[in-house]
From Swiss-Prot:
Family: Belongs to the FPP/GGPP synthase family.
Protein name as annotated: Geranylgeranyl pyrophosphate synthase 6, mitochondrial
Subcellular location: Mitochondrion
Needed co-factor(s): Mg(2+)
Any GO CC annotation of this UniProt entry: mitochondrion
UniProt function note: Catalyzes the trans-addition of the three molecules of IPP onto DMAPP to form geranylgeranyl pyrophosphate.
Cofactor annotation comment: Binds 2 Mg(2+) ions per subunit.
Amino acid sequence: MRPRYSLILSAMRLIRPSNRRLSSIASSDSEFISYMKNKAKSINKALDNSIPLCNNFVPLWEPVLEVHKAMRYTLLPGGKRVRPMLCLVACELVGGQESTAMPAACAVEMIHAASLILDDLPCMDDDSLRRGKPTNHKVFGEKTSILASNALRSLAVKQTLASTSLGVTSERVLRAVQEMARAVGTEGLVAGQAADLAGERMSFKNEDDELRYLELMHVHKTAVLVEAAAVVGAIMGGGSDEEIERLKSYARCVGLMFQVMDDVLDETKSSEELGKTAGKDLITGKLTYPKVMGVDNAREYAKRLNREAQEHLQGFDSDKVVPLLSLADYIVKRQN
């Protein structure tokens, strides 16, 4: 076992036997995929309604219409809807209703879509394929894409504030907005992307430093918005501080696991299978989990993160927690 791999495993807590019993109640793959599709259907409908192409049947002003088209292009089709689904499930887990968290769930997905648009720009990751189709700037141009990204983040705040009309207290709504703001800025996505860009030209003194940098980068770039989805959902559902913290810890593990598997698939699958450019990180010399610890060890780390995630769900209702257990299993097994 490589020293750098043993470092990261030593940081993981031992999994108690009770966690194995909890994981055994996760639904089957087919049941969960059906569950995901049903949730995604509700989410997609809400997202579609959030960005109209007309106003009371009157076409939008042409410049605004073009921005709306760009927003919809990245937001609506494709995507697993992991983040908004997590937001809804977290709300339900602590006793809330799906409808209560739907605006916030849409907001989280809008922030995610906005970040994808920026990440794909030539000055950032310079990608031309996303979800099996040309990236936003390839279709609408860089200027309109940047405007669309800005508009999506603004709309995310507006969506969350609309939760007050659903009976959510202003205090909870404010807390949710603060959590989203944290996830977007230099405590979250911005920091992660900056670290990703800097990592391309950075040298490390030893393997441990390289691994620590990689982990910190993806805590910010990937895991932070997954955390925000769970936290905001629990806030909307009226969860206690303890419940919110446990869901946040679960979501951090899930977010890191998602990135580990994303890196693995980038090296082991084709562009056609992934719906995006495969192998690009390897070509550009970016830090990835397979590069640091190898593909097999990266897969093993993802499995350990899965068990760690399940540990944080101890004590929740055994029926309501099934979707979260199944989500973690789904991510560690995913093929695209």
